[in-house]
Amino acid sequence: MSSIIRKVISTTKAPAAIGPYSQAVQVDRTIYISGQVGLDPSSGQLVPGGVVEEAKQALKNLGEILKAAGCDFNNVVKTTVLLADMNDFGTVNEIYKTYFQGSLPARAAYQVAALPRGSRVEIEAIAVQGPFIKA
């Protein structure tokens, strides 16, 4: 049986993990990206501006981790969006759709009781290194 690659992905352009986990882990060609909240990577603090700015920063952080893995948003096949308030669903969708063009990833969205650091939104993703062939 051949070995499978398992590699930790990290970048200083996204916030360091705030617990005992990796920013992302690559297994073979699949990248599992930990949930990203709207933390500023330089300060480690939640960005001001509520759910709009937090969603933008969370997706920016996600993009930097994708880049560190040799991917971009086109490589994302699944996301999970966690919201402190489901009433923010439409607002987050408006921001989310600006980051994903063409084939949209599968997605689930949930309202949760609380998120780290008082965040209003957290987004995790699974990506696969390409290239892809359209079927």
UniProtKB/Swiss-Prot annotation:
Signal peptide: none
Broad enzyme group: hydrolase
Reaction equation(s) it catalyzes: 2-iminobutanoate + H2O = 2-oxobutanoate + NH4(+); 2-iminopropanoate + H2O = pyruvate + NH4(+)
EC number(s) reported in the record: 3.5.99.10
Places the protein is found: Cytoplasm; Nucleus; Peroxisome; Mitochondrion
Disulfide linkage: none
Expression tissues: Expressed predominantly in liver and kidney. Lower levels in lung and brain.
Keywords: Acetylation, Cytoplasm, Hydrolase, Lipid metabolism, Mitochondrion, Nucleus, Peroxisome, RNA-binding
Molecular function, one GO term: mRNA binding
Chain positions found as N-acetylserine: 2
Keyword Acetylation recorded: yes
Residues recorded as bearing N6-succinyllysine in the entry: 13, 60, 67, 134
UniProt-listed Pfam families: Ribonuc_L-PSP
Gene3D superfamilies the UniProt entry points to: RutC-like
One Gene Ontology term, aspect cellular component: peroxisome
GO terms for biological process, alphabetical: lipid metabolic process; mRNA catabolic process; mRNA destabilization; negative regulation of translation
Role description: Catalyzes the hydrolytic deamination of enamine/imine intermediates that form during the course of normal metabolism. May facilitate the release of ammonia from these potentially toxic reactive metabolites, reducing their impact on cellular components. It may act on enamine/imine intermediates formed by several types of pyridoxal-5'-phosphate-dependent dehydratases including L-threonine dehydratase.
Assembly, per entry: Homotrimer. Interacts with YTHDF2.
Record-stated family: Belongs to the RutC family.
Protein's UniProt name: 2-iminobutanoate/2-iminopropanoate deaminase
Organism of this sequence: Mus musculus
Gene: Rida
